[in-house]
């Protein structure tokens, strides 16, 4: 079997993207890094996004840190998901930054969360800490769009969380709010503050927040598509 090669330009079709992702299945992160002339870090403490960046290189992703999808021409977002030996997610999945001001008139249909999740290429990667980073294998990819029930679940959580933000209750939101979608602080340090609306409608400074998919949502998603043993 010939070795895969990184895509040098963004894929032109979903079929091309999925075929490339399927070629990576079974390879270790160390093998993929070496094939592209990259050094695998010892761990992810200082390189938290390294796995995502590595797979973006292999798949020809275009967006980088821009707000559009990773494969903008296809409308597809890439999500790597660390899993245990049974294929179950080990952590929540970051979706996007939560806007804490200027949300007047925003609906679920026009929201950034829905935009990011309308078409996702999920790539599970072994994530147990007992496995050295370079030896962790890439799993089988899944090209997914939310079905009617999943869309309803996400919409209900999003509406509840956005109501709290708009009504000045952002400081009261905890990771327990939302059944499948949660909001929690997203900042490397406590000094990175952003504007939000306070309880009396005043401007306050608070930690930036991000939307995350809870493990119960992604676990059910992977199980439904037979990616969990």
UniProtKB/Swiss-Prot annotation:
Record keyword Hydrolase present: yes
Annotated GO MF terms: DNA binding; endonuclease activity
Keywords: Cytoplasm, DNA damage, DNA repair, Endonuclease, Hydrolase, Nuclease
InterPro entries associated with the record: DNA_mismatch_repair_MutH (IPR004230), DNA_rep_MutH/RE_typeII_Sau3AI (IPR011337), DNA_rep_MutH/T2_RE_sf (IPR037057), Restrct_endonuc-II-like (IPR011335)
HAMAP family with a match to the protein in the record: MutH (MF_00759)
Main function: Sequence-specific endonuclease that cleaves unmethylated GATC sequences. It is involved in DNA mismatch repair.
Family recorded in the similarity comment: Belongs to the MutH family.
Protein name: DNA mismatch repair protein MutH
Lineage per the UniProt record: Bacteria, Pseudomonadati, Pseudomonadota, Gammaproteobacteria, Enterobacterales
């Amino acid at each position: 079997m010939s070795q895969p090669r990184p895509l040098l330009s963004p894929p032109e079709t979903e079929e091309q993207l999925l075929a490339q992702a399927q070629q990576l299945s079974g390879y270790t992160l160390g093998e993929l890094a070496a094939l592209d002339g990259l050094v695998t870090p010892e761990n992810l403490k200082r390189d938290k996004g390294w796995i995502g960046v590595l797979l973006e290189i292999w798949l020809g992703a275009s967006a980088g840190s821009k707000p559009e999808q990773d494969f903008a021409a296809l409308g597809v977002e890439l999500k790597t998901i660390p899993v245990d030996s049974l294929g179950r997610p080990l952590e929540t999945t970051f979706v996007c930054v939560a806007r804490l001001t200027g949300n007047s008139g925003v609906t679920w249909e026009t929201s950034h969360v829905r935009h990011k999740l309308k078409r996702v290429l999920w790539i599970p990667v072994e994530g147990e800490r007992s496995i050295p980073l370079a030896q962790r294998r890439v799993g089988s990819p899944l090209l997914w769009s939310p079905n009617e029930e999943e869309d309803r679940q996400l919409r209900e959580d999003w509406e509840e969380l956005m109501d709290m933000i708009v009504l000045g209750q952002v400081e009261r939101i905890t990771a327990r709010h939302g059944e499948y979608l949660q909001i929690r602080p997203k900042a490397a340090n406590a000094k990175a503050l952003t504007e939000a609306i306070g309880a009396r409608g005043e401007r306050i400074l608070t930690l930036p927040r991000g939307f995350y998919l809870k493990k119960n949502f992604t676990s059910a998603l992977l199980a439904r598509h037979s990616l969990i043993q």
